[in-house]
Amino acid sequence: MAIKFSKFVINSNGNDVIDITEKVKAAILKYGVYDALINIHAPFSSSSIGVFEYTPDTVEEFLNFSKKFIKTKNHHHIKSLIVGNSATVPFIGGEFELDRFQRILLLDFDDKKR
């Protein structure tokens, strides 16, 4: 079993949800890999990786929900803890095994631009 590693940087405006599906796919395909289990990881304590429906309504509902129910000084760390900082997604035949509207998302819960 071969292990490949790729790293890339995503700029965020803070308190943001960013679709990284195609960026992750490009990183995989550059190695000529078409079938694998892919692990995506966000190394920051205030960001997460999520795999869920990516529509304006879903994103807005999630952000509103998290603001309403997580009102602590360290809210960004708590949100990251709840969602998790990694996800594993099957990659078969050069495509992710995702539902029609599902995407791989970077969720940045920090209030600052980075």
Question: Where on the chain are the PLM-derived regions?
Answer:
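Active-site histidine-anchored catalytic micro-motif
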Residues: 1-114
